[in-house]
Amino acid sequence: METKQVLDRIRQRAKDVLPQGSSLYLYGSRARGDAHEGSDWDLLLLLDKPKLEFEDFGKYSYPLMTMGWDFGEDIRVHTYTKGEWNDGPHPMFYFNVEEDKKVLYES
């Protein structure tokens, strides 16, 4: 599937399932433009709430991840609250993502 088609589907799913105040970013090789065939799709999902709950993964992360199964793409979703992300979860991961992230969806 073409990159634009995958991104359009991700954006539509985000619009359908994510709550108000959410942000979804693409990072990694797909964001930098140096992906190869078979590269995964790295997504960062930030939720505007004080604390993540178990249900958040089933309601928000899982629908984004599983949509890739329908068209043979590996979509990986890393989910944090905005507060957790701004406090810097793991410095190397944080800087890696911040360096090349692209906005896919914000509400």
Where do the PLM segments sit?
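Catalytic core of pol beta-like nucleotidyltransferases
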Residues: M1-Y25, R32-E37, D48-S107
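Short beta-strand->loop micro-motif that forms the acidic, two-metal-ion catalytic signature
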Residues: W41-L46
